[in-house]
């Protein structure tokens, strides 16, 4: 159970769940500058810089990361793992969309899109429509920031400013979404912020809106043992203190439900094919795996893809 969440909480890009999007974008910005980058996100840095002095901006600041690493020998490995994980995750789901459009899908839905810039940076085929669903203030920040820098989408982009706990299917259809057409759905960095029953409801709604041939991709997180969650909380608080930033504890924003359905199993039982890839396998395949202290197999995430029968 999350201690900082309520059934009707909202946020902008600088608070609560919204601020975690800054962390993800900062990791993409750092990855883009590597000589051996797995992804290219030329807009991540701009989106991070405009988000204010949040706790997660420092991930893209090598000097601050080095300072934190000097005071804790395990911090360097931890942040290398965090950045590599985000790079591998982004690479995996970029490839998912590439395969989907190669299969003829031209309708894309990104759930809880945050600072996702795929509508602006991926080479979408003509006729592709990308729907982004998220909190109104989050979508407004991204659109206004990129527009101010002269950045235009590479596909037709339609915003659906609504909380996923509300009637988002109706809002999506009202924006022009056609349930009769195959769709590629993405739930990246989302499910851990939903209670188990809300996750089931989300996939039921996706299934209801999906024509045969639709595809879905999702990231699901493993469950951390309580003692490991506490060690993570203490470590991040210590790091924040050392580099003089406001601490932020993601574990207080997420729902760790041991009865949460495995995504692949849920999909297979509801008319989809499904394949699950452990994130550590994806990281090893791309030579980006980093051993982190106190890690355990259950704490890793899984990347799941499926096709509607």
From Swiss-Prot:
Record EC number: 2.1.1.-
GO MF annotation: an example: methyltransferase activity
Alphabetized UniProt keyword annotations: Methyltransferase, S-adenosyl-L-methionine, Transferase
Gene3D superfamilies registered for this protein in UniProt: Vaccinia Virus protein VP39
SUPFAM superfamilies reported in the protein's UniProt record: S-adenosyl-L-methionine-dependent methyltransferases (SSF53335)
Keyword Transcription regulation: no
Enzyme class, spelled out: transferase
Superkingdom of origin: Bacteria
GO biological process: methylation
Binding site for S-adenosyl-L-methionine: 134, 163-164
Its job: Exhibits S-adenosyl-L-methionine-dependent methyltransferase activity.
NCBIfam families registered for this protein in UniProt: mthyl_TIGR00027
Family the entry assigns: Belongs to the UPF0677 family.
Protein name from the UniProt record: Putative S-adenosyl-L-methionine-dependent methyltransferase Mflv_0743
Source organism (scientific name): Mycolicibacterium gilvum (strain PYR-GCK) (Mycobacterium gilvum (strain PYR-GCK))
């Amino acid at each position: 159970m999350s201690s900082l969440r309520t059934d009707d909480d909202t946020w902008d890009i600088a608070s609560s769940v919204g601020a975690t999007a800054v962390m993800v974008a900062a990791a993409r910005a750092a990855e883009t500058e590597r000589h051996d980058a797995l992804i290219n996100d030329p807009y991540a840095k701009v989106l991070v810089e405009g988000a204010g002095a949040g706790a997660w901006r420092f991930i893209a600041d090598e000097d601050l990361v080095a300072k934190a690493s000097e005071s804790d020998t395990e911090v360097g490995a931890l942040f290398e793992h965090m950045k590599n994980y985000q790079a591998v995750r982004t690479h995996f789901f970029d490839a998912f969309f590439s395969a989907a459009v190669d299969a003829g899908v031209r309708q894309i839905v990104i759930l809880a899109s945050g600072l996702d810039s795929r509508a602006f940076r991926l080479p979408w085929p003509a006729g592709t429509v990308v729907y982004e669903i998220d909190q109104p203030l989050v979508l407004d920040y991204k659109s206004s920031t990129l527009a101010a820098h002269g950045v235009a989408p590479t596909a037709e982009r339609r915003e659906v400013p609504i909380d996923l706990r509300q009637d988002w299917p109706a809002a999506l259809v009202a924006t022009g979404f056609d349930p009769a057409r195959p769709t590629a759905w993405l739930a990246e960095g989302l499910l851990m912020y939903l209670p188990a029953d809300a996750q089931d409801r989300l996939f039921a709604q996706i299934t209801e809106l999906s024509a045969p041939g639709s595809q879905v991709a999702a990231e699901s997180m493993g469950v951390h043992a309580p003692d490991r969650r506490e060690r993570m909380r203490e470590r991040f608080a210590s790091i924040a203190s050392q580099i003089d930033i406001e601490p932020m504890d993601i574990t207080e924003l997420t729902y760790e439900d041991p009865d949460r359905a495995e995504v692949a199993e849920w999909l297979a039982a509801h008319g989809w094919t499904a394949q699950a890839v452990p994130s550590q396998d994806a990281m090893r395949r791309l030579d980006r795996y980093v051993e982190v202290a106190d890690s355990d197999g259950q704490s890793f995430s899984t990347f799941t893809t499926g096709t509607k029968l």
